[in-house]
């Protein structure tokens, strides 16, 4: 087998929407980096059972609506 074919697997801090920080193993970033979530199981309507506002942090929903505005969706 080839050596060094797998990415580095290390511990990072994941910051939830409510501010709590959980340590997880990941290949993202480097040891000790912090990943901040925009949405997580405690705030997602699929897991909370409620209807929540739609988060458009990347502008993807707005871009989609503008692109297909003339189709009457």
Swiss-Prot record:
GO terms for biological process: translation. SUPFAM superfamilies: L28p-like. InterPro entries: Ribosomal_bL28/bL31-like_sf (IPR034704), Ribosomal_bL31 (IPR002150), Ribosomal_bL31_sf (IPR042105). GO terms for molecular function: rRNA binding; structural constituent of ribosome. Transmembrane segments: none annotated. It comes from the Bacteria. Keywords: Ribonucleoprotein, Ribosomal protein, RNA-binding, rRNA-binding. One of its GO terms (cellular component) is ribonucleoprotein complex. Binds the 23S rRNA. Belongs to the bacterial ribosomal protein bL31 family. Type A subfamily. Part of the 50S ribosomal subunit. This is Large ribosomal subunit protein bL31. The gene is rpmE.
């Amino acid at each position: 087998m080839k050596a060094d074919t797998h990415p580095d697997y290390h511990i990072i801090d994941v910051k939830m929407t409510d501010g709590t920080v959980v340590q997880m193993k990941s290949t993202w970033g480097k040891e000790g980096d912090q990943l901040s979530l925009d949405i997580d199981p405690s705030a997602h309507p699929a897991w909370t059972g409620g209807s929540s506002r739609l988060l458009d942090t990347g502008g993807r929903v707005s871009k989609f609506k503008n692109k297909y505005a003339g189709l009457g969706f």
